[in-house]
């Protein structure tokens, strides 16, 4: 999941617009299958033969005066229905979309920005072979040593961050084949890079602050959408204080019931425990209503994975991101602290989609 599972649903409106102008045969996209293992470093890069893809980094930062901040950087690549053999440089074969957000309790609400462009002309791209995505002056680049460099010059803030791995990538699901529903095609290729060490600077109101912290990066690509009865999803990526990492998600139906779920807990030695759909439960503990959209979000969430109980508490209530100018979605994406069985355990991010209105798949 992450920017969880089928963000393709958010892009359907854009894709339908571009496909409506096409008279040639639409391209045939690759399908996700369980028999294809992830291969690094190739799979750090883009996969243009699949319909949709995203790179998603979130984390907690700390300023020199110990002030906590949360950050989100997401780049989407989405293939249109244009004929791939069309030689025109102006044919919009791929769209690049980016979101960035800063969660600062001193501001009292989420600061966020978004961009959209068709790939091409060196202004927007997602390259194959290694992570290198760009949209105007926004970029996320992975070096051969695994370090990521992010530069985001947003409307209300600037991020200049390095994200350095401390662990190997964490393939989700069955070796990177991540089920999102009961049907085998309801799946994505998906891996995470938890426990990234972060250093750099954040600029607010023209003033730069040094920051350090810990981040989580997800990379996911797919072609098929979710179950047609799906309305949204809840997802969490948690860096635990002992070096472990927890990923959990559920897909919700239009009536609110769980359609699918999965969780994975990797300890610091690399051993992974997977949890089946019936072993994962998301239970809202407290809600917050947006004064802008009137959407109500379960911003404090309890997650059960097997015998363990995780309590997620938001850094601040107002972490709603309105991306109707790019992906068409309104969602809640927030920094959270985490307790495990009543004890302080870590920090991470919680994503809540489909609460403003059900996703149109």
Q: What do these predicted regions represent?
A:
Residues 8-21:
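Bacterial N-terminal signal peptides
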Residues 25-361:
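Structured soluble/peripheral alpha/beta segments that form catalytic or ligand/cofactor-binding pockets
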